């Protein structure tokens, strides 16, 4: 293609008679669409015609763009006296072009809108990612609240809190302090209400959402595994769903979070628990059988003062230890989950 361009430039008497479509213009003086009127050559083009062919013969493997770069650099280094004959030739060609095409008007090609399209696609992708990742962000914030709440009951029982933290992957020194736990509880209650409003009673949706967003932090993964996921597999259903007959620390934490979050959420999770049989590994009695009074006290510690006196909240608090104690007898004699 480049050799054809060079040959047509060299063998044509005037630039306006070229049939090359490198520089397009309107069909003002030509009968055929291919014979378009080109702009008259400037001084550099007049000079570079012979130089381009000479350089191409000396370096046959050199690309035409590299030849143009070298010719441009060489043209800049030339003096005005050396450029004068080529400038005069360019003026003559321009005058000839104006005589042959008096109504010629240069209309440059419109710039392609590829950049605008790219910006539009990137903006749409960002919006999709933002809308899809909203649930993950909420779950991540909720996971931080779970981690802080897991470490808060150290004063009530060190072995119980240590077993909760060990089963969920947090170390004992990761989150400490009642103040941080209370603040996290308030934030997690809002996030849980938002999540339940978007996906009521659907734990499997959170499960698929987690796989579509692998960039979520690891604590969020643990929170989903213990609180929000639901799997139809019978051997892992109690661990992945919110079954109260699973791990002691997990079920206790889940009921605590559900009672604080919303009454509708615990109702939906309770329906999931009752509809599916569960198989869970045996857990030591001291790690999953806290006193019901201590349980209600620890749950009510995170409730606001306005909700503490609410009869619906009190009924949920009474229902939690009963539901928890009734499920402790169905755990013994089962196979532990060795694949987790």
Curated annotation (Swiss-Prot):
The keyword Nucleus applies. Residues 1-35, 198-219 are annotated as: Disordered. InterPro entries: HMG_box_dom, HMG_box_dom_sf, SOX_fam, SRY-related_HMG-box_TF-like. This is Transcription factor Sox-1b. Transmembrane segments: none annotated. It is found in: Nucleus. At the 3-somite stage, expressed in the forebrain. At the 12-somite stage, strongly expressed in the forebrain and weakly expressed throughout the central nervous system. At the 25-somite stage, also expressed in the lens. PROSITE patterns: HMG_BOX_2. One of its GO terms (biological process) is brain development. One of its GO terms (cellular component) is transcription regulator complex. The 9aaTAD motif is a transactivation domain present in a large number of yeast and animal transcription factors. The keyword Translocase does not apply. Its main location: nucleus. It comes from Danio rerio. A motif (9aaTAD) lies at residues 297-305. Pfam families: HMG_box, SOXp. GO terms for molecular function: DNA-binding transcription activator activity, RNA polymerase II-specific; RNA polymerase II cis-regulatory region sequence-specific DNA binding. Residues 14-32 have a biased composition (Polar residues). Residues 37-105 bind DNA. Gene3D superfamilies: High mobility group box domain. Keywords: Activator, Developmental protein, DNA-binding, Nucleus, Transcription, Transcription regulation. Transcriptional activator. CDD domains: HMG-box_SoxB. Residues 204-215 have a biased composition (Basic residues).
